[in-house]
Amino acid sequence: MRRRIALPRACWTLAVSKGTKEDILRTYPDIRPERVHVIYNGIDLDEYQKTSDTTALTKYGVDPALPYVLFVGRITRQKGVTHLVQAIRYLPPATQVVLCAGAPDTPEIAVEMRQKVEEARALNPKVVWIEKMVTKPEVIQLYSNARVFCCPSIYEPFGIINLEAMACRAPVVASATGGIVEVVVDGVTGHLVPFDQDQTTTLPSNPDKFAHDLADKISDLMGDPEKARRFGEAGRKRVEERFAWSAIADQTIELYHRLITSPHT
């Protein structure tokens, strides 16, 4: 209720992506488009840098000598991790898959996740499930040593997780939804995987096809280390050019200055 009252009355509204701006305007049609401004989230480029350290991999049972595809995130419908687990059956045999996934938001998805992982492990013993959210230095190691980072989210207003992976030079395979398409450049910093969304459930209308398509794009990079390296380098460059906190701060200051000097425009 507060949001419904506050947003239409605001002189300016900040959105973290163009997709979020579109969602705001669709939900609140009385808001004038020129009053909604997009300023992306940023990332600390000094903190998120590629490292050759593999101590965290060894700690959590990841084989540093074997390429792997990585997921990092909470176990929720929105984050789509179960779709990646479903995709494991379509990956080349013995592909190492690292699921850094914890904090299920419902008991039902916790049970579903465990069941799907057990089924995946029956087909592929190289599935590593880290059932908690690890420390930042540890997740940087996981990003840095991944052949591919996968973000199978059903929706993301922005998807800062992709910035973190790209800053560590990991190529990204991600669903083409929300703000993700404004971060990941298809065929340059990774692969975008489109899917038809059920308008009632917001889930993929064909989950098996989505899983198969995820696997195809992951397999492309797992099997082509040079392409993966090239995409990873391009990802780091894109983050440096577009998403450094210094640039985001400058944009925010400039917008606030306009708000202060012209509060009713």
What role is predicted for each listed range?
Residues 1-13:
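Membrane-proximal helix-turn-helix segments that form the acceptor-binding/catalytic region
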Residues 19, 42:
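Carbohydrate-associated surface elements
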Residues 49-62:
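A short helix/loop element that forms part of the nucleotide-sugar donor recognition site in Leloir-type
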Residues 67-71, 76-90, 111:
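A conserved mid-protein helix/loop that constitutes part of the nucleotide-sugar donor-binding site
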Residues 110-133, 137:
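Nucleotide-activated donor-binding/catalytic signature segment of Leloir-type glycosyltransferases, i.e.
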Residues 141-146:
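Short alpha-helical donor nucleotide-sugar binding micro-motif in glycosyltransferases
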Residues 154:
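Aromatic "clamp/platform" in nucleotide-sugar-dependent glycosyltransferases that forms part
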Residues 171-174, 184, 191:
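Short hydrophobic beta-strand element within catalytic cores of glycosyltransferases
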